[in-house]
Amino acid sequence: MNQNARPHIEKILANLTQLPGVYKMLGKEGELLYVGKAKNLKNRVSSYFVKTIEHPKTQALVARIYDIETLVTRSETEALLLEQNLIKQHRPPYNIMLRDDKSYVYIFVSADKPYPRIASGRGKGKHQIGKFFGPYPSAYSARDTLLVLQKLFNVRQCENSYFSQRKRPCLQYQIKRCSAPCVGLVSPEDYKEDVNNSIRFLQGDTKELNQELIAKMEQAAADLEFEKAVFYRDRLSLLREVQAQQAVFKVKGEADILAITYQAGVTCVQIMHVRNGRMLGGKSYFPDMLGDDLGQMLSDFMANFYFQVADEVPSELIVNTALPDRKELEEALAQQFGKKVQIKSSVRETRAEWLELAEMNVQHAIKGQLSNHLELNERFHQLEQVVGRPIDRIECFDISHTMGEAPIASCVVFDQGGARKRDYRQFAIQDITAGDDYAAMRQALTRRYKKAMLPDLLLIDGGKGQLHMAMEVMQELGLEAFMVGVSKGEGRKPGLETLHFTDGTKIQLPEDSKALHLIQQVRDEAHRFAITKHRAKRDKRRSTSVLEAIPGLGPKRRRDLLTHFGGIQGVLKASEKELTVVPGLGEVMARTIYKILHE
């Protein structure tokens, strides 16, 4: 416990209620550090301040606590819902358990008539209207399914803006992956049948599809329509090939299967998704968690995952360990998603097979993670020896621009668990001379550390000049930061980097140094993040800057224009008459746009 806050904390602990509720741990400046729920507030909050706590992250949290606030609730379920709402609203640093919290990928069939498209996207129903299938654990697995659908049913996957502008079939038609509805080479009725078959495939109804294709092939052969018979034969062959690769179970249902394990300070949770009796795959998570009881840890993970990340919850959740608050979690999930949810830890037959598969995968995943974890720990250890001080958190900055255009500064964050992508930041640099990297770095550092805490090591990509500029910024902010500048070697060849320290010393580490490998890893990630964000900003600016000069053309109509023609090149090629087709534009504005673009 922080000694300065001890009297205040002890007074709070003495007056805590034994009712259920939510507690908030606050730092020196009143910042929210952690939100938790409790069946008994007095017992739970007091447990943080006993001498036997060994978990490093818990110790770090307790050392920063200066105040505690509590909110009493009528039930544990209410406490759980309130806790998750507060986490979603405030994102306290010690509650962040998932390093990768991207939404899952779904395949959707759009509601466009008469020619719907099939595509994939993150999140369910956020930007599209139609039927959704999934979740798929990765974009790769979703793309793999889309490729199969293209080959089987030739349903279009192109954007509407591209589809509406086609005058002749595209390459997808030439390689037999689309029936070219854009130019009318397929009737709406035949296309609708292909869409319906795609939906049946996504729903797992492959057995009936198989029988229908056999019947159509035999009928075509009987009618001496051999070309059509070959077409159905090829589809049937591909469908059987796909069926052989998929894990299909006898039970037609939906479930998520979750298995947790803990080894050598690393926690792993494996989630497998079964929909319509088909195993869609799974994903491994390595959450930063407080606690020692696997059941409670899995319960905390599930609350975080289903309330903060997932877009849906299946009717069954199968787990490899009993949860102490199973009933409360079921009730909270039912309230959140409006459906009954059952959590089961004792299962038989097919469900036992699912759980066994998840447990096999969680053991495989943690072995790989432990290997990476040990390597990363060794890299941190060697870097600590090089710099002569303990390091847990590293931040690195990089600047990216194209001849001074659309400058972006990136800040990436690493700790001994790897990249903390949720802590990454980007800074759009403004009001500087084009191409002035020093001014860009100065602005980024100032904006970052006016409020944010300093890391154990601040890496500055750029060497001595950038390091001196960073030292000036820290002096202006009244901060003492441990900083190292990294300059590239001759020919920018990896392994020849020089490290510059604030006292003027510099060293060049051996090419096989693990400390150097860590620095390269962090620096390269900062470069990747910066250049990705810069290109996105630059391309967006280039595509809209011409249109921004047109009076009376606001952001919405610019967006509609670009969407309709598939980009700025399509707008430039459009005739005045074609421009009038864009909804909400009108003849006068179309004439103005055409005149300005073609002056």
From Swiss-Prot:
One of its GO terms (molecular function) is DNA binding. GO terms for biological process: nucleotide-excision repair; SOS response. Gene3D superfamilies: 5' to 3' exonuclease, C-terminal subdomain, GIY-YIG endonuclease, UVR domain, UvrC, RNAse H endonuclease domain. PROSITE patterns: GIY_YIG, UVR, UVRC. Residues 207-242 form the UVR domain. Keywords: Cytoplasm, DNA damage, DNA excision, DNA repair, Excision nuclease, SOS response. Residues 18-96 form the GIY-YIG domain. GO terms for cellular component: cytoplasm; excinuclease repair complex. It is found in: Cytoplasm. The UvrABC repair system catalyzes the recognition and processing of DNA lesions. UvrC both incises the 5' and 3' sides of the lesion. The N-terminal half is responsible for the 3' incision and the C-terminal half is responsible for the 5' incision. NCBIfam families: uvrC. Interacts with UvrB in an incision complex. Belongs to the UvrC family. This is UvrABC system protein C.
